[in-house]
Every structure is written in C-alpha cells, then in structure tokens.
C-alpha cells in the first residue's frame, strides 16, 4: 500500500563552508492514512524544517519526498502548487491568515481557487469553523480575532475539503490547555476519517494523542515509538533519547 507521506533519506543543508548548517540528516519517515504522528525534539532539532519539506514548501538538498506515491521532485512547480492546494492542509505557528479576508474567506480560499462554487465553499468553511467553536466569528477579520481564535481559523482552513495529508507546526501554541486538547481531538478525528497527520509539538500531553511519536535530535531521527499511554510515560521516553 502506498503511504500518504514518505521521506527517503532526506537531508537539508543551509549555507556552505564554515556557515553550513545541516538541518536534517538522512531522515526516513513514512506516514499512513488514518495515522497521527507527533514529532518531538529540542529547539533546533529540525522539526519545522521536516514539515516544510514534507509539504513541498522547501526542497530537500538530498533525498526524495513522496505524497501519495508521487515524487514531488518529478512534477512541475505548477503541479506541486496544485498538490498543495488539493492534497495538503497546513497549520503553522504564525497562522498565515490574509488580513484582507474574513475568517470564513480565509478558510474557503483554497476551495475557491480549485473551482468550488462560493456558496458550497462557504458552507464547508462554516462547518469547519463550527467544529472548532469559532463559527460566530466567521465574518470577522483576523485583526478582530484573539490569538486563539486566529489559530482555530488556521486549523479550520487546513481541515476543510478532502485533503489527505495534514501538517501542523505547534497548532496549539496560542491556546489554553482545554482548547489545545480540543484541537488534538479534532486532528485525531480527521485521521480516523482517512487523513494522514503529522504534528510538531513540545507538549507531551498533546503528543500522547498520537499513534506514533518520532524523536528528532540534531536533524536526525533518533527513535520512533508507539505513543506511550499518558504524558508522563512520553516524557520519560523523551528523556532517554
């Protein structure tokens, strides 16, 4: 069976000579449909770089990235952009909401770019916002929303439509513990509907929602394990790496 996401011997190098930085070193990772994978590691371990390369926002220096069996390096930039819109949902630390669009317009923009009628797209967008308890703010602009509300809008944009791969970089960073748990529950629910999910987090409580945890250190995968039951077990596992 073809994996939803596969990284084969992926390395990423920034700079050259004395300023050369190895952000990733020969990373191998596969993520299946209906699987939620958490990525943990210290600051600077390559977690965010892994996500941007997996999502075709950066190119690997070495190695292959396959989404649904398609090698991203083998298709044109236009086809890569189309794959990003149709197949991959993103949630990043800085939200990336467009200030001139309302919350629901931000959510539905990828759908409308793919030709979905505005009325249909809005209905889908409102449903996604409702799932995150922020539908009442649908017609507000980003600067009228709190940090937590902007984060939930960004997550709604990532899950709207029929995307098969969800990539989330610290998706609960602006939320309190209750809403953070709600977000992880939503990501978990998405994977149970056939989506493959990868979430970067430094919080063991949230990583314990995953099926599997990948530990990064100095750009390398140092271990992969089935998520232990409970955050205390996960913290102990992390400390041993």
Q: What label would you give each PLM region?
A:
Residues 220-241:
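Conserved beta-strand-loop-alpha-helix hinge in the C-terminal portion
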Residues 2-216, 221:
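ABC family nucleotide-binding domain
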